[in-house]
């Protein structure tokens, strides 16, 4: 179900799927086999193999990184690496010679470095680097990092396996498979990616928390860890499982050198400065270039010596120094010393994708006289097997090497700063000599180098007598278990016969510790001597390395291989997690962009709708006003016409009345006597004419006044109607504006809620992916732990079977020796008859049988106890792992809860601020609308007042015919 949800999260729509695209630096039209010829294999990694290739035209060599891809989308995972290699041009960074995509395989052709990787060189030489060599490498790495960081590139996987050596004694940084190319200078990253042992604390924290991203200073931490790795072969905490080292890095103090006294103060100060857990105070590459440890480096001679030594012809010699005192039933033949030459080793060219595991070898070269063929370490080859989960592999603790200059050189006689402590044991037999005493005459000097990177057990180691000439590993390493609890032995310390007590004590001690017999101890006294001769700057240098050959050499290789496999599996998970994270981020960004586009479209549509409504309302208003004005004009004309017609009729009536009055005046005059008629007629008619004119003027004035009043009333009524309509339209318009703003506010609120829900869901998807990836990682860790526990149990079973098979031989050998010594003792102290002696011998034999039976029972009980302890330890390892995983899951869930809570709180705060800002917006809108309403009212009021103050416009009157006296006559 969870996987289905996970697939749903990462599922993209059909139109969202990215089509195959062309990449700038990758050629698709050319078969790389036509240009390059594969001449060998350099290594393999989590994502493919690395081959040595030769250009068919120029003959130039390249490291061909071949990666099989299932589909086109996987190409995107490698484009960052190709782009970085193509754009970087620096003498200490590998160059890209070409990239091809052909038949589902991606070929990345990288500059070939003959010196190989630094970690492979250390394994080849069985020692760490000297301080001068580390100084040169550090200087050149800082220059490369300064260049990368100036290009906004974070390497994110610095380690010795990704530092390649050239033939000229320079280094080149490689493997940008997990590097990040930023867009901004101050951009930070939150991807949990890299190799655990070299991870900076801030990168480790990103496994469960993305709130504390890191920047380019994570490379500075990895640089410091790499320097410790070069000094000690292994990085700090290499004895821990990769899953536990992350917790160690996050919670522990910054790591330091295991033996600080062997290194210069400047080196220690440089590491202290670089390994600062606070990235804010951690210096940059440019600042570290000014540090005294690297500022004075001017020559790369030390690296040229290193490359020449690693590539020199090797003369191997195997010595087999067996004790002369052979057991009677020893049936194994001695191995004869043999010599053979070995071609210069093919050191691994490239740490493919950075998955080289920490190796278990901890050998270092010291300056001293050339070892002779008879030089042997007095003792046994002890390799301490750490049975805890933190164990990395068996440690080879007895080895030594010498370096001799055939001709004097500038560095002759200088002590190596990083040489390990040395235990000097003098004398073939007897007690060890004190450090300031000369060895006994005829004895040979033995040197045993013991170097444990994780702790310095040999510092201030007290000089003590070695009983019977044997050095028990438990005395050298307190608290550590001897190899297999069964592989240490003791050598007879004297050829005298008075050894009953000491021999018995030795044998019982060895049986208690599970050690092997005298004969078996001699099987481990094989010494492999490697002599390398090379010339640097005209100086011939001879380096001889000696180490004890152990049965567990294959076991070391197997442990290294298994650890490499574990890191590869972790790297694959990281890569897949990174890809899934990128896909999810891309999907989330696409969702967010789509949502924002939809929001914008919705907002635009709403605004457009209301703008259209406003336009329609204004247009409708304009049309209505125009129609009203037209109607008013028409009404005015019609009303004026009607009034004029009525006035004309009234005027006609009035004129008729005047005519009638005129007739009445004439009739009155005619009633007068004839002699008075003429004068009276004239007076009466003049008077009537005056009255008629006055009456007509008054009548016309009244008609005019009535007409003007009627027109004025009509105009006022029209204005009132238009004003009402304007008010109505303004109210509608303002209501529409209110609706528009309210809709916009509701839409804003809904969009913010929707955006919050999307971001919240995306955050849940993000943590779901993190939980999914964390559970996958935990499942892989449990699988690795189960394999580890199974290996420990199988090794214990094999060791116990070997002990069980050896015990009868030990008992037979011991029984014969004790019987011979007892008979010799009876012969020396002869008392009693032969029968008594035979009876004593019989009793002694019976006691021996009882003792041997008790030993076998003791061994069985010890094996059962060991198995119980081992099973308990395995269960403890599993429980501890489960507890760590539960803590991580709990931390992730707790962080998710806090993140969701913080997201909700921020959203609520944002909405509160938005609502607080909404009130002023509403008030501003209402103020604006009220202001427009007041302006309109003021406009109408002023218009009315203006109409009242200004005289009425002249009215076009009817063409009244003025009444005149001529007409009346």
Swiss-Prot record:
| Residues covered by region (Disordered) | 317-497, 828-863, 947-969
Task: List the subcellular locations.
Answer: Cell membrane
Q: Does the keyword Acyltransferase apply?
A: no
Q: Which Pfam families match?
A: Pkinase, PKK
CDD domains reported for this sequence: STKc_STK10 (cd06644)
Post-translational events: Autophosphorylates.
Q: Which reaction does it catalyse?
A: L-seryl-[protein] + ATP = O-phospho-L-seryl-[protein] + ADP + H(+); L-threonyl-[protein] + ATP = O-phospho-L-threonyl-[protein] + ADP + H(+)
Record flagged with keyword Ribonucleoprotein: no
Write one Gene Ontology MF term.
Answer: protein homodimerization activity
Q: EC?
A: 2.7.11.1
Protein kinase domain location: 36-294
Q: Which UniProt keywords apply?
A: ATP-binding, Cell cycle, Cell membrane, Coiled coil, Kinase, Membrane, Nucleotide-binding, Phosphoprotein, Serine/threonine-protein kinase, Transferase
Indicate, by first and last residue, each region the UniProt record lists as having compositional bias (Polar residues): 359-369, 398-407
Topological category with respect to the lipid bilayer: Peripheral membrane protein
Which residues lie in coiled coils?
Answer: 574-698, 839-919
Q: Which InterPro entries match?
A: Kinase-like_dom_sf (IPR011009), PKK (IPR022165), Prot_kinase_dom (IPR000719), Protein_kinase_ATP_BS (IPR017441), Ser/Thr_kinase_AS (IPR008271), STE20_Ser/Thr_Kinases (IPR051585), STK10_STKc (IPR042743)
For bias type Low complexity, the affected ranges are: 487-497
Spell out the catalytic residues: 157 (proton acceptor)
Q: Name one GO biological process term.
A: protein autophosphorylation
The name on file for this protein is: Serine/threonine-protein kinase 10
Q: Which gene encodes it?
A: STK10
């Amino acid at each position: 179900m969870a996987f289905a949800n996970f697939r749903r999260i990462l599922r993209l729509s059909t139109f969202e799927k990215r089509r195959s695209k062309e990449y700038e630096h990758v050629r698709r039209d050319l078969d790389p086999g036509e240009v390059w010829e594969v001449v060998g294999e350099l290594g393999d990694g989590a994502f493919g193999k690395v081959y040595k290739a030769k250009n068919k035209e120029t003959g130039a060599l390249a490291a061909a990184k071949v990666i099989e891809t299932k589909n086109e989308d996987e190409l995107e995972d490698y484009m960052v690496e190709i782009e970085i290699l193509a754009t970087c041009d620096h003498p200490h960074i590998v160059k890209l010679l070409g990239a091809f995509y052909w038949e589902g395989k991606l070929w990345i052709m990288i500059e070939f470095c003959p010196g190989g990787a630094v970690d492979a060189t250390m394994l080849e030489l069985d020692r760490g680097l000297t301080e001068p060599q580390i100084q040169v490498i550090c200087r050149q790495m800082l220059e490369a990092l300064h260049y990368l960081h100036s290009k906004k590139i974070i390497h994110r996987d610095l380690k010795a396996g990704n530092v390649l050596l050239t033939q000229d004694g320079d280094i080149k940084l490689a493997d940008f498979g997990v590097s990040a190319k930023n867009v901004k200078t101050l951009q930070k990253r939150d991807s949990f990616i890299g190799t655990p042992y070299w991870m900076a604390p801030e990168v480790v924290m990103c496994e469960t928390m993305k709130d504390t991203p890191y920047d380019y200073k994570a490379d500075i931490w990895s640089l410091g860890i790499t320097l410790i790795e070069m000094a000690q072969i292994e990085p700090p905490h290499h004895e821990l499982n990769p899953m536990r080292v992350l917790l160690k890095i996050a919670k522990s103090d910054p790591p330091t050198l295991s033996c600080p006294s062997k290194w210069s103060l400047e080196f220690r100060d440089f590491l202290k400065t670089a390994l600062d857990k606070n990235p804010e105070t951690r210096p940059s590459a440019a600042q570290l270039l000014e540090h005294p440890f690297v500022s004075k480096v001017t020559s790369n001679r030390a690296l040229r010596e290193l490359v020449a030594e690693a590539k020199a012809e090797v003369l191997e010699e195997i010595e087999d120094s067996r004790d002369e005192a052979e057991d009677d039933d020893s049936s194994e033949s001695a191995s004869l010393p043999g010599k053979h030459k070995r071609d210069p080793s093919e050191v691994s060219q490239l740490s493919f994708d950075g998955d080289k595991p920490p190796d278990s070898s901890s050998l270092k070269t010291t300056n001293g006289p050339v070892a002779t063929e008879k030089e042997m370490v007095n003792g046994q080859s002890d390799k301490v097997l750490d049975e805890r989960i933190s164990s990395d592999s068996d440690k080879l603790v007895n080895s030594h090497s010498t370096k001799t200059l055939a001709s004097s050189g500038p560095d002759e006689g200088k002590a190596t700063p990083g040489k390990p402590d040395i235990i000097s044991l003098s004398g073939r037999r007897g007690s060890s000599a004190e450090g300031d005493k000369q060895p006994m005459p005829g004895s040979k000097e033995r040197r045993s180098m013991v170097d444990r990177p994780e702790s310095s057990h040999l510092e201030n180691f007290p000089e003590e007598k070695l009983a019977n000439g044997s050095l028990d590993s438990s005395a050298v390493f307190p608290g550590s278990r001897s190899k297999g609890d069964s592989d240490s032995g003791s050598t007879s310390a004297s050829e005298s016969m008075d050894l009953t007590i000491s021999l018995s004590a030795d044998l019982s001690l060895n049986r208690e510790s599970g050690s092997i017999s005298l004969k078996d101890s001699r099987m481990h006294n094989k010494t492999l001597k490697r002599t390398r001769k090379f010339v640097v700057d005209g100086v011939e240098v001879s380096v001889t390395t000696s180490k004890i050959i152990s049965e567990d050499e294959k076991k070391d290789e197997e442990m290294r291989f298994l650890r490499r496999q574990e890191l590869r599996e972790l790297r694959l998970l990281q890569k897949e997690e990174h890809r899934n994270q990128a896909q999810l981020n891309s999907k989330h960004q696409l969702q967010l962009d789509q949502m924002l586009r939809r929001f914008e479209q919705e907002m635009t549509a709403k605004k457009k709708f209301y703008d259209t409504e406003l336009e329609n309302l204004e247009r409708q208003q304009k049309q209505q006003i125009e129609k009203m004005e037209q109607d008013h004009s028409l009404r005015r004309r019609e009303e004026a016409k009607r009034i004029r017609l009525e006035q004309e009729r009234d005027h006609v009536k009035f004129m008729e009345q005047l005519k009638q009055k005129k007739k009445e005046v004439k009739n009155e005059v005619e009633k007068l006597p004839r002699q008075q008629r003429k004068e009276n007629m004239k007076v009466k008619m003049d008077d009537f004419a005056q009255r008629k004119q006055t009456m007509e003027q008054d009548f016309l004035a009244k008609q005019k006044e009535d007409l003007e009043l009627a027109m004025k009333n009509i105009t006022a009524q029209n204005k009132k109607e238009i004003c009402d309509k304007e008010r109505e339209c303004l109210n509608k318009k303002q209501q529409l504006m209110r609706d528009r703003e309210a809709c916009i506010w509701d839409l804003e609120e809904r969009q913010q809620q929707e955006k919050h829900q999307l971001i919240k869901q995306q955050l849940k998807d993000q943590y779901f992916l993190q939980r999914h990836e964390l559970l996958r990682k935990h499942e892989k860790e449990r699988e690795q732990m189960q394999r580890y526990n199974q290996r420990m149990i199988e090794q214990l079973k094999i060791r116990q079977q070997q002990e069980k098979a050896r015990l009868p031989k030990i008992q037979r050998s011991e029984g014969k020796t004790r019987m011979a010594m007892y008979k010799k003792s009876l012969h020396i102290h002869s008392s009693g008859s032969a029968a008594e002696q035979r009876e004593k011998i019989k009793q002694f034999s019976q006691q021996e049988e009882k003792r041997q039976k008790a030993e076998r029972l003791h061994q069985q009980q010890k094996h059962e106890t060991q198995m119980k302890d081992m099973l308990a330890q395995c269960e403890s390892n599993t429980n501890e792992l489960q507890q760590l995983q539960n803590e991580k899951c709990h931390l992730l869930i707790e962080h998710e809860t806090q993140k969701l809570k913080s997201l909700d709180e921020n959203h609520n705060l944002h909405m509160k601020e938005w609502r607080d800002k909404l009130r002023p917006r509403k008030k501003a809108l209402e103020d604006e609308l009220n202001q427009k309403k007041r302006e309109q009212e003021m406009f109408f009021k002023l218009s009315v007042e203006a109409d009242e103050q200004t005289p009425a416009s002249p009215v076009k009157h009817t063409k009244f015919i003025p009444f005149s006296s001529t007409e009346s006559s």
